[in-house]
Amino acid sequence: MRHRKSGRQLNRNSSHRKAMFSNMAGSLVKHEIIKTTLPKAKELRRVIEPLITLAKTDSVANRRLAFARTRDNEVVGKLFSEIGPRNADRPGGYTRILKCGFRTGDNAPMAYIELVGRPATSEAVQEDAQSAE
């Protein structure tokens, strides 16, 4: 029986899952939007939200905790210098999941997961303008 067991297994063992979500969290912090399957996006939300909450108060101890979870100094730096202060007044809900259809090949439901307060890049604005014409 699997009563009160939280989290998705995603057909991986625990070390693979931990490494995958560590890498995905780092990618999300670097790029601020990533495309993945819907179940992975929903699970990633459980990993990244506490990291951003941790980044709201900058201290050596919090930086070490974030590094222990991501293993990337560049990610920790961006987390504490940009993303944490940007969400200082937001009480949770730092990510948004947008469904984007199904993957060709295996028909897996796909989704974009993005950070809520992310600035619109000039490249994305230019692409939207070109596609609208």
From Swiss-Prot:
The keyword Disulfide bond does not apply. InterPro entries: Ribosomal_bL17 (IPR000456), Ribosomal_bL17_CS (IPR047859), Ribosomal_bL17_sf (IPR036373). One of its GO terms (molecular function) is structural constituent of ribosome. It comes from the Bacteria. One of its GO terms (biological process) is translation. The keyword Ribonucleoprotein applies. GO terms for cellular component: cytosolic large ribosomal subunit. Keywords: Ribonucleoprotein, Ribosomal protein. Part of the 50S ribosomal subunit. Contacts protein L32. NCBIfam families: L17. This is Large ribosomal subunit protein bL17. It comes from Pseudoalteromonas translucida (strain TAC 125).
